[in-house]
A protein has these predicted regions:
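Extended extracellular/luminal ectodomain segments enriched in beta-structured repeat modules
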Residues: 70-81, 86-90
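Aromatic- and Gly/Pro-enriched, solvent-exposed loop/edge beta-strand patches characteristic
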Residues: 28-49, 98-192
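N-terminal export and membrane-targeting signals
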Residues: 1-14
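Sec/Tat signal peptide C-region and signal peptidase I cleavage site
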Residues: 23-27
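PGST-rich, cysteine-poor low-complexity/disordered linker and tail segments that act as flexible spacers
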Residues: 97-112, 172-246
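Short beta-strands within extracellular/lumenal beta-sheet-rich domains
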Residues: 53-72, 136-139
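Bacterial N-terminal signal peptides
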Residues: 12-22
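A sequence-level detector for low-complexity, Ser/Thr- and acidic-rich stretches
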Residues: 56-65, 87-94, 100
Length: 246
């Protein structure tokens, strides 16, 4: 019996040693645009039914959280989600007739510059939204989008999108790519629909919340520093002797 106990102890020690594995470098999923405890509800179908129209926008602040739609780490965007209100039949017809057609939106990545200027660096495909009114829908990107820490993940709406929560606290605000003096011109087309466009998100709208977010996979973190290149002063290794001829 004592011999068996010693054998089992040795086996356990051997097994435990075998389970000591190297550290793993994993990527992680992250949500851009989500705030814990914040579940905004779009305004539609209440009256007035307010929607985002013909612009590109991003959330600037939610309570004490700032920034909101900014990429936290280098990685790749893989999907985006949007919570949509459910406009009534007459409300939907009004938007379709006056804002260029059926509700639609796409994800847009902005590289921020100075004084609220941004450059469009990437975009996803335009998605039709009307089939998903009254729900939260997630769209996978056909091709993931590489992003850098500090980039802004915005929503471009070429027509309209019932994805706007109103009557929020005064500490909540979002920005749109409308110019100075044009913040109340909701009919003018200011949606950014071309990569490399330079735009300015001048207009700030308080007490309102955009109801979209994006999902990203962060780059894996290295578990060891990169190997240093050998110094020029390091001694050269001796070459092996040449084979001797018989």
């Amino acid at each position: 019996m004592e011999t068996m106990k010693r054998s089992l102890a040795a086996l356990a020690a051997t097994t435990g040693a075998a389970l000591v594995l190297p550290a793993a470098a994993y990527a992680a999923l992250a949500d851009v645009g989500k705030v814990p405890g914040d579940e905004p509800v779009p305004a539609c179908p209440q009256s007035p039914c307010l929607a985002i129209s013909r612009t590109t926008g991003y959330q600037a602040k939610v309570g004490d959280v700032r920034p909101v739609d900014v990429v936290p780490e280098d990685g790749r965007l893989v999907a985006w989600s949007i919570t949509l209100g459910k406009p009534g039949t007459k409300q939907t017809a009004f938007f379709n007739e006056n804002l260029g057609g059926e509700a639609s939106a796409q994800l847009t990545v902005l590289r921020p510059g100075r004084k609220l200027y941004h450059r469009v660096v990437a975009q996803g495909d335009v998605q039709k939204l009307q089939p998903y009114f009254g729900s939260t829908v997630q769209f996978a990107l056909k091709e993931s989008i590489p992003v850098k820490k500090g980039y802004v993940v915005a929503l471009t709406v070429p027509t309209c999108a019932p994805a706007l929560a109103v009557s929020q606290p005064g500490t909540t605000s979002w920005r749109a790519t409308r110019g100075k003096g044009k913040c109340n011109d909701f009919d003018a087309q200011t949606a950014q629909v071309g990569v490399n466009n330079i735009t300015r998100a001048y207009c700030l709208y308080r007490t309102a919340r955009l109801t979209y977010s994006a999902t990203m996979v962060t780059d894996p973190k290295p578990t060891a520093p990169p190997a240093e290149a050998p110094s020029a002063d390091a001694p050269a290794a001796a070459a092996p002797p040449a084979p001797a001829a018989p």
